[in-house]
Amino acid sequence: MGQLTKKFGKIPVSLGIPHLLNLQVDSYVKFLQEGLAERKTDEGLEGVFRSVFPIEDFNRTASLEYVSYDIGEPKFDQAECISKGLTYEAPIRIKVRLVVYDVDDDSGNRTIRDIKEQDIYFGTLPLMTEKGTFIINGTERVIVNQLQRSPGIIFEHDSGKTHSSRKVLYSCRVIPMRGSWLDFDFDHKDILYVRIDRRRKMPATILFKAMGMTKTDILDYFYKKEFYRISADGRVFWEVQKDMFRKDSAFADIAGPDGTVFVKAGKPITKRAWRQICEAGLETIEVAADTLDGLFLADDVVNPATGEVLAEAADEVTPGVQERLREAGIDRLPILHTKGIDTSSSLRDTLVLDKTADKEAAQVEIYRRLRPSSPPTPEIAESFFDNLFRSADYYDLSPVGRYKLNQRLGLDQSLELRVLTDEDILTAIRVLLHLKDSHGPADDIDHLGNRRVRPVGELVENQYRIGLVRMERAIKERMSLQEVSTLMPHDLINPKPVAAVLKEFFGTSQLSQFMDQTNALSEVTHKRRLSALGPGGLTRERAGFEVRDVHTSHYGRICPIETPEGPNIGLIVSLTTYAKVNDYGFIETPYHVIRDTKMTGEVVYLDASREHGEVIAQANAPFDAEGKLADEYVTTRVKGDVLMSPREEVTLMDVSPSQMVSISAALIPFLEHDDANRALMGSNMQRQAVPLLQCEKPLVGTGMEGPVAQDSGACIIAEGPGIVRYADADRIIVSYENGLYPERGGVRAYDLQKFHKSNQNSCFGQKPTCHPGQIVAKGDILADGPGIEDGELALGKNLVVAFMPWCGYNFEDSILISERTVKEDTFTSVHIEEFEVVARDTKLGPEEITRDIPNVGEDMLRNLDGSGIIRIGANVKPDDILVGKITPKGETQLTPEEKLLRAIFGDKARDVKNTSLKVPPGIEGTVIEVKVFNRRSGEKDERARLIEEYELGRLDRKEQDHIRGLGDATRVKLMAVVEGKQIATTLAGKKKGEVIAEAGASVTAEMLADVPLKKLSGLFKNREVNEAVDALLESYDQQVQFISNIYESKRGKVTEGDDLPPGVIKMVKVYIAVKRKLSVGDKMAGRHGNKGVVSCILPAEDMPFFADGRPVDIVLNPLGVPSRMNIGQIMETHLGWAAKEMGRQLAEMLERNDPLKALRNEVKRAFDSPAIDSLVDSMDDEDFRASVAKLGRGIVTKTPVFDGAAEEEIWSWLVRANIDEDGKTVLYDGRTGERFHNRVTTGVMYMLKLHHLVDEKIHARSTGPYSLVTQQPLGGKAQFGGQRLGEMEVWALEAYGAAYLLQEFLTVKSDDVTGRVKMYEKIVKGDNFLEAGLPESFNVLVKELMSLGLDVTLHQEEGKKRPKRVGFMNAL
């Protein structure tokens, strides 16, 4: 029976949280397209193959075409790959076709001569586990999703920062998925330049000409024409065009045909007057005679008599030009409209600057700029230009890029068109010109509409394409070198380039990361992480403040809280709880649709661009009885701003208050009362919590604990309705009823992990929560994982906390904790260390793993078996031998004495040295597992044979359990068919002569309980029943055979030996479980960023205690709360205390055997929830008692973020629990028994132990390794280094006058080589005097000065007395 839980949330949850690993798993499934009847040809692996094939040779005499691919079964399962250090991968085979052509020399036509089709092994492909991870070389890795600038077009300006004039310069950039970038930008003179691939800039009109446009075409496209008439008397008239409104002042009165004056001379033309002028039908308006000066011609002006070009298009109309035109009798001039509100002459000015004449010249110029080294010809230049943006082989916008281009430029091109068209470029320039001339706003590059997620599938797809392109080059070369007609496809294809690229990506890429496996939460958050770093992304050094900052478009998509502290802040972020990534890679968040102030029940997922302009209400907006928005004005978000909008305008509404934060932040109760900085620390530190030996879920939770634990993959969850057939600590067997696993008869066996080492060395183990015979439904928890209780995350412990100072032991966030937590193993965790030893074949002979080690006493070998490997269960401490190993030594020159002994006692024993694997310092624990790996052809030692026998026995037991479970399930199915049916013959029992039923008897369940299934064949009178029974038995036999084959394959893998690296004879891995109890120096934290280090573990009797004698568990500093502003911890403390006390009171009522009716009423009063009332009423007495008994530890409460318990509710709970409303109480000093002066805030807080454990960090050194150059001790625990003495420490010692101590530190204990030797000699002789020499670092300095050309010599002055000798032991 589940635990009774009090939920404080008031907003109904109408939409479930999507599976937390969907992004990873779905992306890779889409990439593989495995098992699909018809694969999509433009995406995933299929799309990659189709984009590279067909491959033709240079003469077009042969073509290698791709047909299909097939992914096989992996050779080893996931557990075997982790154990043996292998990659979890599957073989991939491709079917290709080689077509050979005959080419006609004259016509160039091709005819098919030969076709060869072949299946080819194409290497392996790493597979994703169901948990969203990859197993590479035996370790679990995660491919982090990359957050990258989206392909498409973006318009920007420099905000006046580029040029000294502070002029705002506009630019635009077209970014493809693959191919050349195209940049257009203005300089301070308003000339428009283009850059291709960020090379040297050139006037943009060169690009237009290269596209085939003439000078006139360019002007006609970008400018409107206006016409001016010049009368014989020199007056100038402007022809009225309705769509060309002039704001100028009138030169003369503008009047209609009837004499009505619309605008008086000298007055500006208004829009109203312009409308009247157009309606009156005026054809021309007189303008000033000098109006034409400085304008530009729209067309070439030709002398009608002679055909001579008097002025060219784009020429400026100067008085001289006007004179020439007047002489030729031309009275109507076409002029470029450059004086409008939002038009300028910038493109015309660019055209004048451009000296290229035509298309050919422009293409040659572009070729010269991009390929300055090679001389161009028109043909090469044209081909090169066409390949830049128009060829699908070299340029790919991708559907995303085309979608963004269409969206921004208002085009309606097909998403299949993935190259740039002339229309795209011209429209982009038109939009850019309009933006510049109207001083419009630039696009926001940090808006999530302009950033997209590249999930794992796309990242691997890109790597696969790189590998295939490399292979393509090799294939083309091979085709040209050899006679293709004699070749088969497998002669041409070599998959090694693809394998190398994949290996590099999964092994060393910045986005392929060692999985953070500290606990279930850290696994899930790592898979939901988005990184702006990585190839093609940003770098820490270049990323500015803007890209790291929280943006309004992040709402509901990216968590504003969870990000690392330090240099990566804001660059690595997390998806929010409800966020999804759509097919284009944009992050979407769900909303309820609101129509006519009513919620429609429809939910839409929108990306940041599509959300623009919607009026979005918060999830807590109240509704009235009719289901309409209750308030006249509602708090809404519109285009990122928070407004009060009329309820009629609301179009969407948030689905949940927790949709704006990530899962880590959603696990913090009362998040709304915490400062964001502390919430960031809180969400990060929960990921560092070590799973404890005894899990306990928080009394004050948020409701996110269940989804996180269940989606993490750490639990085992029922996949459908069924019955548990078998359950123990090692495995659970379930028979499912809904057609799952038909080949196994619906029976699935789950192996539970026991003492499994995680990536962070924490101990992962699963424990069953079900029992045999239990009926389960889909989603039920069958087994809990590490740090999980009842399918809910349980990373810490509920402790009774007091906020008070205690003798300075909680100064600066230090933590005082009760010794009871150590005695009861409250914060004890198990960590597993792996040690490996390898026996190699050396030049001097093979190394050997053996118990026979020279010069080692029997007491050191007592735990080793005959093979020299430690026994399981041995308790080991530092310097104990785990695996005995000897290595041959080189022959040494013998002394005469040794030669004499050799002559007397015969040949010496082999000259070997002891290279045994020993326990390193700081490790003390129990050996829990040993693995021995032998070469396939190698001899197995006794220990290897024992391990093999054990593994085979375990597999046999598993197979029998599995078949037994299948038999039980089949028996149930048979009973449904035969129950009540009559048997035709006597049914005999197992014992000789035993009769279970006579012929004609009706079958019952008891009758068939012990009868072997085979005996039921042909037993019944009814022929149809016999046929049904035979069909079931036949199916059972096939399923048994299927299961047997699986286990036979596993047995073969156990016995066949291992693939070891070259030169390795044998490898042994030893696993030691280390129990780490809580100790002084361990780091602990709450969920609100309240971290600290344990400063003192105090006996329980000395801890402050309540009036009834119960001591508190932990004492925290009250000064840690006000300045940090994380008040959530205080609210959690109060609510936790009330929950614990009320639970205790209810459990005491149960123990006192109070009447159940009174107890039921008390439970209802405590929970105060209609849902709990009906649940309590529906329970029988036994279930009710069990549920109340669980409340003894406290009532589990759920207070969701932004929708949690209000202060009034917490106060009312405190009052119900008979606690003072202010949450303070009187405490007594455990040492004196006296009451503390002030009442103290006490309660229950959930505390975590973090993986920064003092036992893993502390170490001590007497002597150890030294640096070669400086001769100073190395640093760090891994190098067994010394303690660094910095200048501040030197000052402190100087201040104390500890001169000899300081001299010792700076010389013999550091880098005085001769002084070290002398000191050792003196200690041995008992002559304890310090004689310091010259530090080696001084010699290094001298050598450095010499390297700079300075001659440095040392002189000792005569007559100087040496200092008096002082004993260095006395100086201490």
Curated annotation (Swiss-Prot):
Catalysed conversion reaction: RNA(n) + a ribonucleoside 5'-triphosphate = RNA(n+1) + diphosphate
Group of enzyme by EC: transferase
EC number: 2.7.7.6
InterPro entries named in the record: DNA-dir_RNA_pol_bsu_ext_1_sf (IPR042107), DNA-dir_RNA_pol_bsu_external_1 (IPR019462), DNA-dir_RNA_pol_su2 (IPR015712), DNA-dir_RNAP_su2_dom (IPR007120), DNA-dir_RNAP_su2_hyb_sf (IPR037033), RNA_pol_bsu_bac (IPR010243), RNA_pol_bsu_CS (IPR007121), RNA_pol_bsu_protrusion (IPR007644)
Pfam families, A to Z: RNA_pol_Rpb2_1, RNA_pol_Rpb2_2, RNA_pol_Rpb2_3, RNA_pol_Rpb2_45, RNA_pol_Rpb2_6, RNA_pol_Rpb2_7
Domain of life: Bacteria
Entry keywords, A to Z: DNA-directed RNA polymerase, Nucleotidyltransferase, Transcription, Transferase
Record's GO cellular component terms: DNA-directed RNA polymerase complex
UniProt xrefs under Gene3D superfamilies: 2.40.50.100, 2.40.50.150, 3.90.1100.10, DNA-directed RNA polymerase, beta subunit, external 1 domain (2.30.150.10), DNA-directed RNA polymerase, subunit 2, domain 6 (2.40.270.10), RNA polymerase alpha subunit dimerisation domain (3.90.1800.10), RNA polymerase Rpb2, domain 2 (3.90.1110.10)
Family annotation (CDD domains): RNA_pol_B_RPB2
UniProt-listed PROSITE patterns: RNA_POL_BETA
GO molecular function, one term: DNA-directed RNA polymerase activity
GO biological process, one term: DNA-templated transcription
Role description: DNA-dependent RNA polymerase catalyzes the transcription of DNA into RNA using the four ribonucleoside triphosphates as substrates.
Family in the record: Belongs to the RNA polymerase beta chain family.
Subunit structure as annotated in this protein's UniProt entry: The RNAP catalytic core consists of 2 alpha, 1 beta, 1 beta' and 1 omega subunit. When a sigma factor is associated with the core the holoenzyme is formed, which can initiate transcription.
Name recorded for this polypeptide: DNA-directed RNA polymerase subunit beta
The species this protein was found in: Nitratidesulfovibrio vulgaris (strain DSM 19637 / Miyazaki F)
Organism lineage string: Bacteria, Pseudomonadati, Thermodesulfobacteriota, Desulfovibrionia, Desulfovibrionales
Encoding gene, per UniProt annotation: rpoB
